[in-house]
Amino acid sequence: MNLETKIPPPAICFICALLMYISTEVSALADILPRFPILLSVVLMVFGTALGVLGVWAFRRVRTTVNPFNTEQTEHFVSDGVYRFSRNPMYAGMGCWLVAWAGYLAHPLPWLFLAAFVVYMTRFQIMPEERVLAQKFGAEYESYCRRVRRWL
């Protein structure tokens, strides 16, 4: 299988988080946005972690691969548990972390990197995965895509 990217999604998330921080340090823009209360940031991070862990657990439960670069080894189609609410809970969890971080940084530029994360992951990770899953699981997967959102 030939995915458009070979960069692991957690690395993309980390790079975006790092760029978010750097952008606040080098920007001449003032911190014009209100900072998220620390409790809100923590809640979003816990929620994001839960999404990711539940997504991994659902894959492990049916013994299918969690490796985003080996989708051809996918043997089971998971549509229960957290996958009833999101087709990509692991990536949505990373997005929650970035929302928490951007809100905590209280600066407009980090939000651009959150948008870049969503666009990049959708184009270079999720869409290629979806093509493989549609090919492998056909009408069942297509029906699932009509019922469940890609992110949240």
Per-region residue spans from a language model:
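Membrane-anchoring alpha-helices and their flanking helix-loop junctions
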Residues: 1-80, 92-152
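Solvent-exposed interhelical
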Residues: 83
